[in-house]
Regions:
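N-terminal transmembrane-helix/juxtamembrane module of multi-pass inner/ER membrane proteins
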Residues: 1-66, 110
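Cytoplasmic juxtamembrane interface segments
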Residues: 1-3, 66-81
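Hydrophobic alpha-helical transmembrane segments
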Residues: 54-68, 84-92, 142
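Membrane-interface loops
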Residues: 29-43, 73-159
Length: 160
């Protein structure tokens, strides 16, 4: 890989992409308010609502930067770039798909009951995160890409 500014400053590269991604996603949330396609299958109707699912949902958001920084600091630099480039490219392609064909989900319960931390967190999440721009799933893509990075990384080949 050429030794340009981004390769010399991988944290700067991640910060640059983070700002780009958040700006693009914010634009999508503000400008595409009704999906062209509602994504649904009968299996969706069989999945019960579970307010405790917010725990792994929010853990997912910590898992991404943790993995990026872990590979940056512990693994050979090539392992970091083998994660970073496909991850960011896939997220950008997903954003383009959302512009071309907006999708949405209609799976949320009408009301979330309870006053515990989980119910309050779900209500806050529903108020701030629209059920739009869901297919292709960035959550699924990122999870698969991160797991592939762990499986392919040289640091896990060594005996412990």
């Amino acid at each position: 890989m050429r030794n340009n500014w981004f390769t010399r400053h991988p944290i700067g590269f991640m910060a640059f992409y983070f700002v780009f991604y958040l700006a693009a996603f914010h634009w999508l949330e503000a400008n595409i308010t009704v999906p062209d396609i509602w994504v649904h299958c009968r299996l969706d109707d069989l999945i019960p609502f579970c307010k405790y699912a917010v725990v792994p949902y929010f853990a997912w958001f910590a898992w991404i930067p943790f993995t990026l920084f872990y590979l940056l600091w512990k693994a050979p630099r090539s392992d970091f770039w083998r994660l970073c480039l496909p991850l960011f490219a896939g997220m950008t392609i997903a954003l383009a798909c959302y512009v071309i064909l907006p999708t949405g989900l209609d799976l949320r319960p009408y009301r979330v009951y309870g006053s515990d931390i989980f119910a309050r967190t779900v209500r806050w999440l529903y108020a701030t995160d629209t059920p739009l721009n869901v297919c292709p799933s960035i959550h699924v893509f990122n999870s698969v890409t991160l797991m592939m990075a762990y499986y392919r990384s040289k640091i896990f080949d060594e005996p412990r």
